[in-house]
Amino acid sequence: MNIGFIGLGKMGRVIAGRLIGAGHQVRVWNRSPKAVEELVAKGAEAAARPADVARADFLVSILANDDAVRSVFIDEGVLDAATPGLIHLNLATVSVALAEEFAAAHRKRNLGYIAAPVFGRPDAAAEGKLNIVVAGDPTAIERAQPILSVIGQKTWPIGDRAERANAVKIAGNFMIASAIETMGEAVALTRAHGINAADFLNILTSTLFAAPSYKLYGGMIAAEKYQPAGFTAALGLKDIRLALAAADAHNVPMPFASALRDNFMELIATGGGENDWATLAVLAAHRAGLD
């Protein structure tokens, strides 16, 4: 398949690498040239400007936030330059409002749009073990399945309205952040009673909370290791704000999301923004006087 790819951050570069490894023709663009050079060495073609990648059958993008998506796709003319009939798979965690806006913008230009946010960190992406939540035209999703099957281990369709996939992703990330926060507070409580964090978390993640997220982040909290960051606290704040905006639009109270937002803001204000978002546990320990 002829694929354009925009966004070569931690996730994007490994996903693009998998597509190249699967034999697809991939043309890449990224603001930072170093990531482009890395992919060219693996067989990708470098695009001089973002609009050049839109002359393809499929376009895959994974950018940091709504502003980056609008800047590249609208301001830099990617949508207007796209080949008619192109199908765009947007893997990014963007707002529900932007998903609605972009679905309409693609329809207006006779382009397909699939909201396809992913669950998983860069190591899972490198192994093709992401879970992909997809929403959009069923025919477009079927056509894109050869790409989706390279990127992830399972595709979860959630209907034809693009914004639904992003609502699922945002809600899921809220749940992960909530799990990290509760583990951090529980560890602070048990540490205050003389219990080793690793011992406590080993019990809980082997019994009541044996899910992968608890094991992964529990291990990070026990080891107090928040670098390298698979997902930063700054990105965590971005996603909690997306959850609150989506909730506000439908009058859904989310009091714990508001508390998480404030905690992430405090972390960032005190220099922890580029640490893994599991560093929420550090804030809980600090407030308990356990520095």
Q: Residues of each region from the PLM?
A:
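NAD(P)+-binding Rossmann beta1-loop-alpha1 motif at the extreme N-terminus of oxidoreductases
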Residues: 1-62, 81, 86, 122, ...
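Hydrophobic residues within alpha-helices
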Residues: 15-16, 35, 102, 147, ...
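Hydrophobic beta-strand scaffold residues
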Residues: 26, 46, 112-114, 155, ...
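Rossmann-fold NAD(P) dinucleotide-binding segment
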Residues: 50-111
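Rossmann-fold dinucleotide-binding core
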Residues: 74, 92-174
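Helical "substrate-binding/catalytic lid" subdomain
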Residues: 162-288
